[in-house]
Design a protein with these regions (language model features):
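Conserved helicase ATPase motor motifs in RecA-like P-loop NTPase domains
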Residues: 30-32, 120-122, 139-164, 190
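Conserved RecA-like P-loop NTPase helicase motor core
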Residues: 287-390
Length: 460
């Protein structure tokens, strides 16, 4: 049975498509609301009306593509693997360039609905500021598709380039959506969980660099006024232990009511993820698995966790958007990626409602300046800071998706410090060589005292 918003959105899409005036529909619905089911409903109605012959779905990762294949196959009651007898197929954006001329010649003979999931991954404009995925869509798909349906939970780009096929208002540069379903409405409709974000800070930080000692009352002050980087925070033993302990305690509380509830840790690197998994198992006595883009079969790892009662899954770039694991209810955000888009997509992983008695959703992260801002703006569906900026000069996109795993495209790289050193937080910490964490630092020692937490509860 469709949710109310899914039925309403599907009806509006069909109405627009049948008007014979417009063939593109843009839906913005909060992460976790069920956009794929809505898209499959649109396809089903178009088939019933005899308006299409095939459906092609494109998404940013294999994980999402597999999920779309299952949903469309279920909704259309047929195979959806692109083979003989199927009504379509599900592919990644990266695969578009590898589909040969015979494929495009064949599908161009039919009336096709093309569904673009997480369309914000694809940028294009006439000024040359396009990425490879956006160019592929314009050059190979836009002209032959009878209808196009674009989906996004976060319809903006961190580089503030225009999304392919999207319309923008002037002069504020806000994306124009045919249908919007925000997080507040989703919470009120009990479609999504009400998020609570915990910002972890420290009141007594000290940094030793040579003979100099600096003292700070917050993480923000320390990062702004010293050579300490955010990488130092997320790799520090005391900091990691504190955030993981907080997450483990909350997950234990939730599992008293909902025994299958799980937690997600978003790490900054494979080495970081392995360290976190080891801590969860050995220090906190938790069951934990790990999934990264270096795994031979990450989809199997994710599916195995989805069906199990393992407490934690530690991920590097694999469970950030579009991955449907409703039993996730706690998240420890320890990634070095600090963009609003990534933050919201990660938060969306713990917001999907299921039939468990407890429906709490908790995200733990550190009180870094940008992360604080993201948390405080969580009630805005499209933050003002994420508007498309029109530039006079041609600026090519700095990212080429073909060189990176699709799930890590948004990741930024922190600049290395020039001097190796020893790093320590807290009076009882052992000194650790910062080179072992994959980066270098320009200070000798970092100590901190009492941790504190600030909870932001949205939509109260």
């Amino acid at each position: 049975m469709l949710r109310a918003w899914q039925a309403e959105c599907a009806s509006q899409a069909i109405e627009k498509f049948t008007s014979n005036k417009h063939s593109h529909f843009f839906c913005q619905a909060t992460p976790g609301a069920g956009k794929t089911v809505m898209a499959a409903e649109v396809a089903s109605r178009l088939f019933e009306r005899g308006m299409i012959d095939l459906v092609l779905c494109f998404s940013p990762s294999l994980t999402v593509a597999e999920g779309m294949q299952k949903t469309f196959s279920w909704k259309l009651e047929c195979s959806f693997n692109g083979g003989l007898g199927s009504l379509g197929g599900s592919y990644t954006y990266q695969s578009i360039r590898f589909l040969d001329e015979n494929f495009w010649n064949t599908v161009s003979k039919y009336r096709v609905l093309v569904v673009f999931d997480e369309i914000h991954h694809c940028s294009f404009d006439d000024e040359g500021r396009s990425n490879s995925w956006g160019l592929e869509i314009v050059n190979k798909i836009q002209d032959f598709a009878r209808y196009t349906l674009a989906l996004s939970g976060t319809p903006w780009r961190s580089d503030r380039l225009p999304i392919v096929m999207a319309e923008y208002s002037d002069p504020d540069g806000k994306v124009v959506c045919d249908y919007q379903y925000g997080l507040q409405q989703a919470v009120e409709d009990k479609v999504c969980r009400r998020p609570k974000i915990v910002l972890i800070d420290n009141e007594h930080l000290s940094v030793k660099a040579g003979s100099d000692n600096q003292h700070f009352a917050s993480i923000i002050d320390c990062l702004k006024q010293s050579d300490v980087s955010y990488q130092s925070v997320i790799h520090n033993e005391d900091a990691m232990n504190f955030i993981l302990n907080s997450g483990c305690q909350k997950l234990a509380q939730i599992r008293q009511e909902s025994p299958s509830a799980g937690g997600l840790v978003v790490a900054s690197s494979i080495k970081h993820a392995k360290d976190i998994q080891k801590r969860l198992v050995e220090h906190f006595n938790q069951s934990a698995c790990i999934v990264t883009y270096h795994h031979d079969n990450p989809l199997h790892e994710i599916e195995s966790f989805r069906q199990s009662k393992v407490q934690w899954i530690v991920s590097v770039g694999m469970i950030s958007e579009g991955t449907d694991i409703p039993r996730l209810q706690v998240c420890c955000h320890m990634s070095s990626v600090k963009t609003e888009l990534y933050f919201r997509q990660v938060l969306g992983r713990i917001l999907r409602i299921n039939d468990s008695p407890n429906q709490e959703a908790w995200l733990y992260t550190f009180a870094e300046e940008s992360l604080i801002g993201f948390a405080e703006r969580i009630e805005q569906d499209i933050p003002d800071s994420c508007m498309y900026i029109k530039q006079e000069n041609n600026v090519p996109s700095a990212i080429d998706e073909k060189r990176l795993p699709s799930s890590t495209v948004s990741e930024s790289v922190q600049p290395n410090r020039s001097q190796p050193s020893l790093l320590s937080w807290g009076e009882t910490s052992d000194m650790i060589n910062s080179n072992n964490a994959g980066f270098t630092l320009a200070f000798d020692e970092l100590r901190l005292g009492q941790f504190k937490q600030r909870v932001i509860a949205a939509f109260i």
